[in-house]
Swiss-Prot record:
Identification of the protein by name: Large ribosomal subunit protein eL34
Molecular function via GO: structural constituent of ribosome
Source lineage: Archaea, Methanobacteriati, Methanobacteriota, Methanomada group, Methanobacteria
Keywords, ordered alphabetically: Ribonucleoprotein, Ribosomal protein
Keyword Transmembrane appears in the UniProt entry: no
């Protein structure tokens, strides 16, 4: 019986082959879901998905696109937003 904290499905079950030839069950936290646009819900490109300790190892320029609203709005929604701002 696994420890209580591993019985939840928030942990992914991974079978590892050890050097001794045994298959051992390991528990791994699942990857977070992909980032989506705040307006239309479309998947965002250029935004890595991973656990915080993996993302923290990346350079700032690799964490999200270097444009206004990068990592928050998709490119088409950002374009619409800029047009509306200019028209006001």
């Amino acid at each position: 019986m696994p420890a209580n904290r591993y019985r939840s499905r928030s942990y992914k079950r991974v079978y590892k082959n050890t050097p001794g030839g045994e298959n051992v069950l390991r528990y791994k936290k699942k990857k977070p879901s992909k980032h989506v646009c705040a307006e239309c819900g479309k998947l965002l490109h250029g935004v890595p998905r991973g656990r915080p300790y993996e993302i923290n190892k990346l350079a700032k320029s690799h964490k999200r696109p270097n444009r206004p609203y990068g990592g928050y709005l998709c490119s088409s929604c950002a374009r619409k937003h800029f047009k509306n701002e200019a028209r006001k």
